[in-house]
Design a protein with these regions (language model features):
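Gly/Pro-enriched, hydrophobic low-complexity segments
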Residues: 2, 6, 12-17, 21-38, ...
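Surface-exposed beta-loop interaction hotspot
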Residues: 32-55
Length: 162
């Protein structure tokens, strides 16, 4: 599973090695692992409870632990809070390999696209151990643009930047 990042400032594409997925993403509180995609089969799950959502108590959330199967993961587990009405993730707690709470990711300002896709416009990652945080703001999402896997090769990413 290759992971690449395009760096527009230097107009280059860089491969992220699997051993660096736990490293910081451009000096932020996010790691490359935090920003990558994953499949349901990549984790084992344990439902803990249905409870009020920690970010909006008027909503009910499922509290679920997930345990990564990948031994190279930087986390021993994650605890997520997903609302039961629209299945939007509101918060994820990340526990390091020693089992200590390391970071909390909070999702804010959701919008629905094409009548079905909920996306957060603000993601705040707080490092509990250092007190530092990083906010990612997303301005606009686009769907159904006809992109293929070939549009995301390192060569294509560099070509589109010209």
């Amino acid at each position: 599973d290759s992971q690449w990042i395009f760096l527009p400032a230097i107009k280059r594409t860089k491969r992220i090695s699997s051993s660096n997925r736990t490293g910081k993403f451009v000096s932020s509180e996010f790691s490359y692992e935090d920003l990558g995609s994953e499949e349901v089969a990549d984790n084992d799950y344990l439902w803990l409870a249905d409870m009020p959502c920690p970010t909006d108590e008027s909503l009910s959330c499922a509290q679920v632990e997930s345990y990564p199967k990948n031994p190279r993961s930087g986390y021993s587990k994650r605890v997520s809070y997903t609302d039961l009405d629209e299945y939007r993730v509101h918060k994820i707690e990340f526990y390091n390999r020693r089992g200590d709470l390391e970071k909390i990711l909070t999702f804010e300002d959701y919008s629905q696209y094409l009548g079905q896709y909920w996306r957060s416009h603000n993601m705040i990652m707080e490092n509990i151990q250092t007190g530092k945080s990083t906010r990612l703001n997303w301005g606009e999402y686009s769907f159904r643009k006809g992109l293929t896997e070939q549009d995301f090769t390192p060569q294509a990413l560099e070509r589109y930047s010209r």
